[in-house]
Amino acid sequence: PSSEIKELVSSIEFKDDAKKVFFASNPQIENKDSFASKCINRAEKTAVLGCYKDSEIHVLDVKDPQLNGIKEVTAAHEFLHAIWARMDDNTRKDLGKKLTEEYERIKTPKFEELMKNYKETEPEEIENELHSLIGTQEVEISADLEKHYAKFFNNRKKIANFYKQYNSKFTKLENEIENLNNQLPNLKKEIDDKTAQYNSQLEQLDKDILNFNQRANNGSFNSQQQFDRERHQLALRKNKIDSYNKEINESIDRFNVMRQRLLDISIQNEKLYDSITTNLKTSNKI
C-alpha cells in the first residue's frame, strides 16, 4: 500500500482483521479524472466521494485542508460496503432490521433527503447504505450497533466526529447563505418603501417651502410670530426628513455589506463543493 493509504489506515484505527479486509479491497486514493472514470457511471444528484466497485475501494483525493478527515470517513464508509458484501443473507437481514430501526430513531430532514436519493438510484441497497452511513456519520447509536461496528474499528466515534467536523463547514456556510437570501429581499423592500415615503415627504416639503417663501415675499404673514412659527415648523420637518434619509442610507449600507458577504461566502461554498465534486455541485454523499 502507498504511504497515504497507510496513513489513512492508521488514522481510521481498524481492528487487525478489518485491516486485512480493507487491504484486500485494494484501496486507492485517486484524482478527479481517475476517480470519475471508475465511480461516476450515472446521473448523480449528489457529490460522490468514494465507491466500492468490483470488490475495490476508491476514494476521491480531496485536498482542501478545511475538509480534513473526509478521506477517512469515505474510506471507512466504503470499507463497510466491503464488509456488507461478505455477510450472509441471515446476518444482513438481522442487521438490516436494526439499521432501519436506528434510522427511524435518528433521521433528520437532510438524512431523509439523502435516503430518498438512494431509493431512486439504488433501491435494493438501502440497508447496505444505512450500514455505511450510520457507522461513519452518527456519533451516538444503539448499543447493539455500536457492538457490531466495534468488530472493525477501535474508535468508531472518532470517524463520526471527523464527519461532524467537515460537514459543519458546509452546514455553517449553507445556513448563512440561506439566512442572507431570506433577509436581503425583506431589507430591499423596506428600503424601497422608505425611499418612496421619503421622496413623497421631500416633494411635499419642497412645495411647502416654496409656498412659504412666496408668502414671505408678498408680505402675507400677519405677524413676525406667525412667520417664525411656520418657519420653525418647516425646519423641524426638514430635520425629520434628513434623519429619515440618514436611516435609509444606513439600511442601504447594511444591505450592501450583507450582499457582499453573500457573494463572498457563496464563492467559499462553491470552492468547497468544487473540491469534492466530479460532476454536480450539490449536497455531499459518500
Segments the model singles out, each with a brief description of its role:
Residues R237-I286:
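C-terminal amphipathic alpha-helix
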Residues S2-D54, R92-E203, N213, L234, ...:
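Metalloprotease/metallohydrolase-associated module, dominated by Zn2+-dependent proteases
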Residues H58-T74:
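Short pre-active-site segment immediately N-terminal to the catalytic Zn-binding motif
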Residues K97, Q225-H232:
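Short, charged, amphipathic alpha-helical segments
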Residues S55-H58, L80:
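Glycine-rich, often proline-containing surface loops adjacent to acidic residues and nearby aromatics
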Residues K194-D228:
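Extended alpha-helical coiled-coil "stalk/arm" regions
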Residues A85-M87, L95:
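Short, solvent-exposed loop/turn and secondary-structure capping segments
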Residues V73-A85:
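Active-site recognition of the HExxH zinc-binding catalytic motif
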